[in-house]
Amino acid sequence: MSNVIAELGNATKRTDLPDFRSGDTVKVHVKVVEGNRSRVQIFQGVVIRLQGSGVGRSFTVRKVSFGVGVERTFPLHSPIFEQIEVVTRGDVRRAKLYYLRNLRGKKAKIKERREA
């Protein structure tokens, strides 16, 4: 039974995803359906959480829009979004960046990771 579930999970996994982790700034191209039309909306922010494994893996992106913090959680292997672009790599020491919710301005800025 577990082999059937594993095969089904592997069939629905996406292969076009870049490597990213907590602290990275990403652009998520989200498909928005309005009536009979669909369009692509870009949600850019910092990845504050990666959770789960396999097909059930999800990630949360946080941005500040007009002074209000907005967080959105996406299933990683979902057809909800078209693509993910990594804008910058962040240098953080935590896997979950919930402390960013309480920081404002320059204190909420994440140091950029240098690639060697």
Swiss-Prot record:
Q: Which family does it belong to?
A: Belongs to the bacterial ribosomal protein bL19 family.
In its UniProt record, a GO molecular function of this protein is: structural constituent of ribosome
**InterPro entries on file:** Ribosomal_bL19, Ribosomal_bL19_CS, Ribosomal_bL19_sf, Translation_prot_SH3-like_sf
Q: State the name under which the record lists this protein.
A: Large ribosomal subunit protein bL19
**One matching Pfam family:** Ribosomal_L19
User: Which gene produces this protein?
Assistant: rplS
Protein's UniProt keywords contain Ribosomal protein: yes
Q: Name one GO cellular component term.
A: cytosolic large ribosomal subunit
* Cited function: This protein is located at the 30S-50S ribosomal subunit interface and may play a role in the structure and function of the aminoacyl-tRNA binding site.
Task: Report keywords, A-Z.
Answer: Ribonucleoprotein, Ribosomal protein
Tagged with keyword Transcription: no
One GO biological process this protein is involved in is:
translation
